[in-house]
Amino acid sequence: MSLEGIGFGYRERAPYASNPAFSRGRLVPEPESPTRTPFQRDRDRIIHSTAFRRLKHKTQVFIAHEGDHYRTRLTHTIEVAQIARALARALRLDEDLAEAVALVHDFGHTPFGHTGEDALNERMKNFGGFDHNAQSLRIVTKLEHRYADFDGLNLSWETLEGLVKHNGPLLGPYAAHPDIPVPQPILDFNARYDLELSRFASLEAQCAAIADDIAYNAHDIDDGLRAGLLTLESLDEVPLAKRLLDIVRTRYPNLDPVRTGHELVRRQITIMVEDVIEEAQRRLASARPGTMEDVHNQPRALVGFSDAMRAEEKVLKRFLFKNLYFHESVVVRRHAADRIVQDLFDACFTDPSLMPDEWRLGCEALDKAALARRVADYLAGMTDNYAVREHRRLFDRTPDLA
């Protein structure tokens, strides 16, 4: 397979790409825009939403913005969107749809990253649980209040199915995680608007999913080096990183550690992107899909790492879990964040009047499950800083996350 010619000039859309001219439309019908495709409108609505702005103050790994240069959900999302567009361009897909799915994929994340999600899921275990992907769907179909004619953003079918299924089907023989029940909010919405949960999502959504992996694999290394939790020497334990570092050290023997780290990160992104493009080309040549429907009916994803790169990526992930995500200083802050989220849930569930007017109005008429879901919606929308301030206001004993 060849990378020749990619990125230089116009290349005709592939027949298996998502075509905005044949979009399945929106849950609430709207007149089409004369100047933008449906997927471009989706991207624009996502960017202008409140949920998108909140990503600025939600963390990836490092809690409470321990430095101005660490990544937040917003910077991560922008990086994922850039990689997703690059992959879509290389494979002659619809770049706007790939970008839209990438931009919306993290909307449902709680404050304090996966720590906040785990804490909220624990409190919601008797009320249907909490899942950030399902929460993303709730935000774009219900919780955003911007438009006169509908709740949410009324995104196109293609963007919604990409959001819900970008990591693979949720039901059926090809379900990515058959042992995990589908979150109830997804099932509830799917009963109104069938997202075909047993079939694979578009190639554009698959680009967004693998772009997420590429981005955080590389950029968590960057942040870990910046924080001093990782060293270039420790990264020599990872075969992929060592191979790239050897190239950098040979070419630039006197390069300072900061630039060496950046050279590693950029080369890792490049090698992973090129691997995905070449592997996708191989899978497409083998499957020979002629239409978008053929993509949906495949027995596996057509965009992904090669077996060799997937094996190397697993080694890298194990290294990051051991040396970064479970580093003592990170774990201490995660325990504090866990306590903040659970304290806030308990307080607001017991006394809904503690929530702002827009959230507490009508709570007296809700049963326990509905009240728990409203409290979860409120907490999930918090930024890290707002959660800390609210905890301090209510308890005056907030753990120090700085």
From Swiss-Prot:
One of its GO terms (molecular function) is dGTPase activity. PROSITE patterns: HD. Signal peptide: none annotated. Residues 73-217 form the HD domain. One of its GO terms (biological process) is dGTP catabolic process. Residues 20-39 are annotated as: Disordered. It comes from the Bacteria. Keywords: Hydrolase. Belongs to the dGTPase family. Type 2 subfamily. This is Deoxyguanosinetriphosphate triphosphohydrolase-like protein. It comes from Brucella canis (strain ATCC 23365 / NCTC 10854 / RM-666). The lineage of its organism: Bacteria, Pseudomonadati, Pseudomonadota, Alphaproteobacteria, Hyphomicrobiales.
